[in-house]
Amino acid sequence: MIEPQKSTDVTQALLQTYPDLKVICAPTTVGIAAAAKVLQDNGSSCKLTGLGLPSEMSEYIGDDDAHSCPYMFLWNPEDVGRLGAYTSIALVNEEITGAAGDKFTAGDLGEYEVTEASDGGTEVILGSPFKFDPFNIDEWKDVY
């Protein structure tokens, strides 16, 4: 489990150790929210990006000095769910076996290929994450 307090502590330590720090890239939704709060509360000029939930990050996203996060990313959960469903159906219907190199169509999401994962298994990768910024955050903050 990822704890917000650890991310808060690490962000505070980074700011203390590196007072001229320009940017933090947070790889988790918990980490980016905790770091954003620390940066904003401290009036830091350090910027932040990474993976975040629009509902938790909308107040920190902006393209001015008052906001710590100019943009962040996350995969659209609807697309993640749809790809998971199409993958499961392809497995059940024996269109794929789950072996690296298997290919299938995931409806309007397009064509996908099963690839080797770093842990020795296989995986299906959705693709690039969605970018949230000051221009679109309001339409997403109530979605997830």
Question: What does each of the following model-derived ranges do?
Answer:
Residues G50, F73-L74, D133:
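Structural signal for conserved beta-strand scaffold positions within catalytic alpha/beta enzyme cores
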Residues D64-L74:
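Rossmann-fold dehydrogenase core element
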Residues K37, D41, D63, Y86, ...:
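Short, well-ordered alpha-helices that flank and scaffold nucleotide-derived cofactor binding pockets
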Residues C25-T28, F73-E78:
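Active-site nucleophile and cofactor-binding loops and adjacent substrate-binding regions
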Residues T87-Y144:
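Hinge/cleft segment of the Venus flytrap/periplasmic-binding protein
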Residues K6-T8, L53-E59, W75-F104:
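Hydrophobic alpha-helical segments within soluble ligand-binding/sensing domains
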Residues T17, D64, L91-E95:
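Generic structural signal for alpha-helix termini and adjacent loop/cap motifs
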Residues M1-Y60:
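Hydrophobic alpha-helical
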